[in-house]
A protein has these predicted regions:
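Walker A/P-loop
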Residues: 1-28, 41-47
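Conserved RecA-like P-loop NTPase ATPase core
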Residues: 1, 16, 71, 91, ...
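C-terminal alpha-helical "lid" subdomain
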Residues: 137-194
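Conserved AAA+ ATPase "SRH/arginine-finger" region at the nucleotide-binding site
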Residues: 109-124, 131-143
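Conserved alpha-helical scaffold flanking the Walker A/P-loop in AAA+ ATPase domains
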Residues: 33-59, 69-80, 115-122
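Loop/turn-to-beta-strand initiation segments
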Residues: 25-26, 49-53, 82-89
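Conserved catalytic/switch belt of AAA+ P-loop NTPases
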Residues: 63-112
Length: 194
């Protein structure tokens, strides 16, 4: 799941976990510094009577970091068969997970990398192994206002739609722009004023 900040990527994972918890779904959050342990984690849970999501939040790598290679090997590499009860989910603000530079794409310039296309393939190979990519985009101004009004009504805030829109517009300009997170923070602010 990738896209703009505050658009609900992590919230979607939590919603899936809550929805399917009664059916035996469990979530294990793995942090970047724990990538080396992925094989051990999978070995420990692959025969359990639950279904698992191994979840990595806000995953991205700088071009000099190599931890992503452990993740690549686990997703579709190695000799061990894929576990039927385990899925790997990641959220990121970066579409390709690994930082790209203009040098990566410019085949005309001379750099230290003799085979630049190999470098690009290496960087893209991680995201391609996930199989499914879901994009989260910022809401339009109209959608943002609909989110604000819906949240306000759920919380019993008695402001008129017109006043809500006016105040929400001021709020988003100084608090991170159009996103579901910004809408929720605005509602929390209004609730705190009551």
């Amino acid at each position: 799941l990738y896209g703009d900040r505050g658009t609900g990527k992590s919230t979607s994972i939590k919603a899936v976990a809550n929805r399917f918890w009664p059916d035996g779904l469990r979530v294990i959050q793995v942090y970047r510094h724990q990538m080396k342990m992925l094989s051990r984690i999978i070995s420990a849970i692959r025969t359990r009577n639950y279904r698992f999501i191994i979840y990595m939040d806000d995953l991205s790598f700088e071009d000099f970091e190599t931890e992503y290679k452990y993740l690549k090997a686990v997703i579709e590499g190695g000799l061990e068969s894929k576990a039927e009860n385990i899925l790997i989910y990641a959220t990121s603000n970066r579409r390709h997970l690994i930082k790209e530079t203009w040098d990566d794409r410019n085949d005309m310039e001379h750099t230290q990398d003799m085979h630049r296309s190999d470098t690009m393939e290496e960087k893209l190979s991680l995201v391609n192994r996930f199989g499914v990519t879901i994009s989260y985009t910022k809401p339009t101004p109209k959608e943002f206002m609909e989110i604000v009004i819906t949240l306000a009504r759920k919380q019993g805030i008695a402001m008129s739609d017109e006043d809500l829109k006016k105040e929400a517009n001021k709020w988003e300009l100084s608090h991170g722009g159009l996103s579901g997170r910004t809408a929720q923070q605005f509602i929390n602010y209004l609730l705190g004023k009551e």
